[in-house]
Amino acid sequence: MAKINDNYLKLKAGYLFPEIGRRVRAFAEANPQANVIRLGIGDVTRPLPPAILKAFHDAVDDLAKVETFAGYGPEQGYDWLINSVIEKSYNKLGVELKTSEIFVSDGSKCDCANILDIFAMDNVVAIGDPVYPVYNDTNVMIGRTGEADDRGYYKGIVYMPCTEANGFIPTLPTEKVDIIYLCFPNNPTGTVASREELKKWVDYAIANNAVIFFDAAYEAFITDPAIPHSIYEIEGAKKCAIEFRSFSKTAGFTGVRCGLVVVPEEVMGSTATGEAYSFNKLWLRRTTTKFNGASYPVQRAAAAVYTDEGWAQTKEIIDYYMENARIIREGLAEAGCTVYGGVNAPYIWLKTPGGMSSWEFFDKLLTECNVVGTPGSGFGPSGEGFFRLSAFGNRENVIEAVERIKKNLK
């Protein structure tokens, strides 16, 4: 009999969002008259901007003609998209990158998981708590950890609690680690890191020969001009950081699927015999072996984001979601809730009232308000007693959900 990967059996219960879906379905079946408003999983609700949709249509039409047909493309992505990314996303920040350092993918969730392929198993990993579950679970799946303890912490991972006391910004590990996961603007807490805070992490990584995995999936939602959009705005970061970006929330690509990874040629690792080796070369080898590239129409649509018309339309949608965030944040504050985030990120992180647990508050909102959010404890032990609401709903639903919650909590 073929043997399974027993590491999967270490995972705690089900993945967070499928578990939420299961509970909501059960409630809806028992209460078919209920109008349930979902502000939980961060899926977008606005349609693709017209300029992006036109590029999509034009690319599909290209596939219908011999002269413009596109088959297998470059595994790393088409140069016309990569050059647009460099010019419009990085050069404006004062960051210079080579085309060889950017890899177009089918989404940052996969990238955050797949990047582990090029790192040795005995690397020590540091992860924030609370955290996007993919960081934690993928390390469990590949066998980097032991079993979880009663808190949900897996042996072999260094957890960095993010609490009210430290402003939900992790503090530097006291021990040496090799891989550090950072996500700013943060999912789930909605917090951001200043240049000074990021400089501490870059300095730590360089001093300890560590690599930072920097998830910048929500950088387009930053409104404060003082907040960095990329880790590479920090001096020295190109020597120690790999950055992940996504079109999912920025341009509404959750159903389209496109992202990118930046692996600077300066980021080096060590072989088993102690020789320095480029992670860029390893990621290129991994990509060309395991990936055939994002589809041609998808990359054409992604490139349209960087046109003047495409970005103007995309920015309108980002502003729409951030207005939702303001409505949620201010509405909950009026109801007496302690709230964080929602200023430079599309997530609102609220403290559950009356000392309720995260799942107790989930059930209260679902059954009494018919509103779905995400229990903070699902993101890690330090998320207990907190709750995440997403600003990605449509305006009418957001206003209605906030009014229901305010009425219930008063």
Swiss-Prot record:
Q: Where does pyridoxal 5'-phosphate bind?
A: Y72, S108, K109, Y132, N187, Y218, S246, F247, S248, R257, N292
* Keyword Transferase listed: yes
- Name the cofactor(s): pyridoxal 5'-phosphate
SUPFAM superfamilies per UniProt? PLP-dependent transferases
Among the GO molecular function terms of this UniProt record, one is: L,L-diaminopimelate aminotransferase activity
- Supply the InterPro entries for this chain: Aminotransferase_I/II_large (IPR004839), DapL/ALD1 (IPR019942), PyrdxlP-dep_Trfase (IPR015424), PyrdxlP-dep_Trfase_major (IPR015421), PyrdxlP-dep_Trfase_small (IPR015422)
Q: Where does substrate bind?
A: Y15, G42, K109, Y132, N187, N292, R388
Q: Top enzyme class of this protein? A: transferase
- Transferase among keywords: yes
Query: For this protein, what is the EC number?
Result: 2.6.1.83
Pathway assignment: Amino-acid biosynthesis; L-lysine biosynthesis via DAP pathway; LL-2,6-diaminopimelate from (S)-tetrahydrodipicolinate (aminotransferase route): step 1/1
Per UniProt, the keywords (alphabetical) are: Aminotransferase, Pyridoxal phosphate, Transferase
Q: PTM N6-(pyridoxal phosphate)lysine: at which residues?
A: K249
Reactions this protein catalyses: (2S,6S)-2,6-diaminopimelate + 2-oxoglutarate = (S)-2,3,4,5-tetrahydrodipicolinate + L-glutamate + H2O + H(+)
Biological processes per GO annotation: lysine biosynthetic process via diaminopimelate
The subunit structure is: Homodimer.
**Chain's role:** Involved in the synthesis of meso-diaminopimelate (m-DAP or DL-DAP), required for both lysine and peptidoglycan biosynthesis. Catalyzes the direct conversion of tetrahydrodipicolinate to LL-diaminopimelate.
**NCBIfam families from the UniProt entry:** DAPAT_plant
Query: Which family is this protein grouped under?
Result: Belongs to the class-I pyridoxal-phosphate-dependent aminotransferase family. LL-diaminopimelate aminotransferase subfamily.
Q: What is the protein's given name?
A: LL-diaminopimelate aminotransferase
